């Protein structure tokens, strides 16, 4: 049985009464449609990142990303968010990894993609509450910033390290 406690623009909160292996349990669950995140390299092989204000943490450096619209496919969201946040279009989005940032109490899945065939086409198309700027960095510098704790965003860490790991194995 599910009891909806709250429904907002981005997330909801429900309490579930479940039976797991014959035992009655309660689970509080933050419900989120999920997100798409994008690793995109420009024509000079620099990783395109955004410096974005994320309350309550202040400004963070992260890969472009955004929440799925209702019934939107993750790949479509990735194309849309890349263009909105960076002004770049991509010819192709290749799935990299899907992961659950808070699996015990949150339904959110983050779908990470690698964009290719990039072309600068427009200025940023930010949502009214987004405060960000585009920055470009060498991939090795991004790895160094992760190692030094300067990049702390989980989707960025997961996507960058997965990409580096897969490249190293190939």
Residue spans for each PLM region:
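Strongly charged, low-complexity linkers/loops
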Residues: 107-145
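Acidic pyrophosphate-coordinating catalytic loop
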Residues: 4-6, 99-111, 168
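Nudix hydrolase/Nudix homology domain
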Residues: 2, 22, 70, 129-170
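The catalytic Nudix box helix
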Residues: 62-95, 113, 127-130, 138
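Acidic, metal-coordinating catalytic segment for phosphate/diphosphate chemistry
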Residues: 2-37, 42-43
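Active-site-adjacent beta-strand/loop module that shapes the phosphate/pyrophosphate-binding cleft
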Residues: 12-14, 18-22, 102-121
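Conserved Nudix-box catalytic region and its N-terminal flanking loop in Nudix hydrolases
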Residues: 36-80
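Short, well-ordered beta-strand micro-motif
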Residues: 15-17, 40, 114-116, 136-138, ...
């Amino acid at each position: 049985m599910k009891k909806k406690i709250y429904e907002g623009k981005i997330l909801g909160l429900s309490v579930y009464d479940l039976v797991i292996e014959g035992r009655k349990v309660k689970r509080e669950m933050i419900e989120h449609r999920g997100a798409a995140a994008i690793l995109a390299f420009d024509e000079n092989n620099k990783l395109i990142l955004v410096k974005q204000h994320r309350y309550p943490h202040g400004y963070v450096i992260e890969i472009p990303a955004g929440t799925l619209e209702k019934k939107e496919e993750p790949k479509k969201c990735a194309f849309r968010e890349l263009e909105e946040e960076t002004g770049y279009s991509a010819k192709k989005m290749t799935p990299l990894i899907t992961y659950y940032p808070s699996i015990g109490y949150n339904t959110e899945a983050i779908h990470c993609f690698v964009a290719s065939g990039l072309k600068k086409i427009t200025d940023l198309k930010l949502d009214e509450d987004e405060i960000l700027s585009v920055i470009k960095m060498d991939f090795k510098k991004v790895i160094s910033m992760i190692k030094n704790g300067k990049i702390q965003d989980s989707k960025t860490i997961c996507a960058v390290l997965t990409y580096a790991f897969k490249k190293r194995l190939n």
